[in-house]
């Protein structure tokens, strides 16, 4: 049943997701494409985690953070993609009330965790380039673990604000969501209760995560740029900058899509455009991160080559 009587309200027990399209042919095409992307996402990020674990050359803070970033990528993609794939194959795309809350909070958890991990990686690059003599002390195992744990705690707090706000909403029968997953904005539009407080809570939580991590990344790279420009050796400049290009690319992709979805005025783009950008943010970007780091990072390419050479000659 979609609705259950609850006092003077009709409580919603499930939501109908309109998805990306109702064209049956296009649904099959999108199912195939997104399934392939998801398989590459999971296999690519798992490979990154395993490679960092087995390669002693990659037992450095940067790759410790990268392995957790890969875990967050799998979590972010898995919070939405499996349900979306199932919905491509059924005529009526639904998600239970509880499932909607879990999906919403999972996306908030891994999205925020990824923000803080990217900020931690920027701080790591700042210490490596601007304070190389203090790097081993300032980025000790204890500090790295604290940054990782802090990232997950921040993600959990962000997810809690989303989940508590969701369970505080009242729904009076309307249960059709014009999206492919349970996002807070369309859910707030469906609610028959006063959502102003919860919108402020969500905006504050998501805004704090974004602003704080962007600030850390911007300050870190400002100092990095100043330090690189002061280097007299061209080779030194190139080497220092090459260690940052992969991370900068990942940051640009991630925050570019986040800015489009959550910062730009809703009137500046259509709902269909928002869906496309959301797919890019939650499905495509998690696939691109391992490719970016493996293709642009010489240490990872070297570790991959040594690993395959051992496999070939063993």
Swiss-Prot record:
Gene Ontology terms describing biological process: G protein-coupled receptor signaling pathway; sensory perception of smell
Superkingdom of the source species: Eukaryota
Disulfide cross-links: 100-192
Function in brief: Potential odorant receptor.
Protein's organism: Mus musculus (Mouse)
Keywords on record: Cell membrane, Disulfide bond, G-protein coupled receptor, Glycoprotein, Membrane, Olfaction, Receptor, Sensory transduction, Transducer, Transmembrane, Transmembrane helix
Single GO molecular function: olfactory receptor activity
Similarity section: Belongs to the G-protein coupled receptor 1 family.
TM stretches of this protein: 29-49, 58-78, 103-123, 137-157, 200-220, 241-261, 275-295
Extracellular face residues: 1-28, 79-102, 158-199, 262-274
Compartment(s): Cell membrane
Matching InterPro entries: GPCR_Rhodpsn, GPCR_Rhodpsn_7TM, Olfact_rcpt
Keyword Cell membrane belongs to the record: yes
Chain ranges on the Cytoplasmic side, renumbered to this chain: 50-57, 124-136, 221-240, 296-314
Annotated glycan sites: 8
Protein name according to UniProt: Olfactory receptor 5P66
